[in-house]
Amino acid sequence: MGKTLFDKLWNRHVIYGKEGEPQLLYVDLHLIHEVTSPQAFEGLRLENRPLRRPDKTFATMDHNVPTEDIFNIQDLVAKKQIEALQTNCAEFGVTLADMGSDRQGIVHMVGPETGLTQPGKVIVCGDSHTATHGAFGAIGFGIGSSEVEHVFATQTIWQQKPKSMGIEINGKLPKGVYAKDIILHLIATYGVAFGTGYAVEYYGETIRNMSMEERMTICNMAIEGGAKMGMMAPDETTFEYVRGREYAPTDMDKAISDWKTLQTDSDAEYDLHIKMDASILEPYVTWGTNPEMGVPFSKAFPEIKDMNYERAYEYMGLKPGQTAEQIELGYVFIGSCTNARLSDLEEAARIVKGNKVKNNIRALVVPGSRQVRNAAESIGLDKIFIEAGFEWREPGCSMCLGMNPDQVPDGVHCASTSNRNFEGRQGKGARTHLVSPAMAAAAAINGHFIDIRKVAVISGGN
């Protein structure tokens, strides 16, 4: 029987262990940031251990970065964590994309942008959205602080092999429907736990026609569907994205020859298989307190089916039967490791250009990295957003999570391009609605959600 992409990647990295038991995997790339690394570095010091492979470790600042003034850190814990990463990287010889550096940004954007993220690798990070890197034909998953220390010390990690799931996505995306809507649809349809215990491979005509940025959006939110990791087979789109980047292989022809073998064999079988038709999708909006609680734009919010729904409606200040258009928005956030890449900002700018943010809305655009910010400014996107009334910020995780000054006030509804809508995720009492960048941009200039498919300047589809 043939092998799946996941099988091939996993088998390449097993150092020790029997099938059905935890196995020791070699780690090709360890990405770190300021929040989950201090304890791990301190553990090395206490045991007087060196960091085994500083050349396979890369650090950046993202979670705690103040995006209005990156060097004005008021929170003492955040300041201490950032200073600790600077000290630790200097002491242990780790390359750091520091505050203000041209390489600084959200860790899951910096890896791909620098060419560190490549097909065939096992990539770990002390952050759950490490699944993003699977878009390159890699294994990427988040780890805890004790596991970060283990990787520091050994460049390996113990893991139980997940089962395999194949999600086949075919059909042309309709105008106004994006990669974000695909993953929101999957989670709304199958639930936040459907991927538990699985490594998910997304494939099919729709995936093949996507850019790397779109692919990263889908893999980024594999974790929201419960999966251990998400991945896609590498192809010419992947190879051209990696080519010429700072850490790309010196012999690209040789690398590509190997990467082309990273495909699921025609006679391979997944443990679970799902088929999806992308051509019938609509823009999605979440109404509740987990990503499963979402609906196509044309549908009303569902009836209460259990205590979780009842609690979600109470927290969100909404009722069954209402529609997305009726949500009283106060904030719009375009950013996060899900949707803060250049193509996301370009699509949002197309909608915003020549319009003004409504008076009831405070709108932020936070590029996911310094590279994206510089590229956006080089083509004038910053001016479009600023003239429309958006705040144009420095790169960082920003309003995706309530760990920095960018937070949504208590009881306020926010249209957000991020990945999680849990209670308090964007600040105490914040009410988060997950959408695509186009939907968020349109909400900002209309003062509420609208059917993005009726906007003339949008693209979407593939």
From Swiss-Prot:
Keywords: 4Fe-4S, Amino-acid biosynthesis, Branched-chain amino acid biosynthesis, Iron, Iron-sulfur, Leucine biosynthesis, Lyase, Metal-binding. InterPro entries: 3-IsopropMal_deHydase_lsu, Acnase/IPM_dHydase_lsu_aba_1/3, Acoase/IPM_deHydtase_lsu_aba, Aconitase_4Fe-4S_BS, Aconitase_4Fe-4S_dom, IPM_dehydratase_rel_enz, IPMI_cat. GO terms for biological process: L-leucine biosynthetic process. Binds 1 [4Fe-4S] cluster per subunit. It catalyses: (2R,3S)-3-isopropylmalate = (2S)-2-isopropylmalate. Its cofactor is [4Fe-4S] cluster. Heterodimer of LeuC and LeuD. This is 3-isopropylmalate dehydratase large subunit. The lineage of its organism: Bacteria, Bacillati, Bacillota, Bacilli, Bacillales. The gene is leuC.
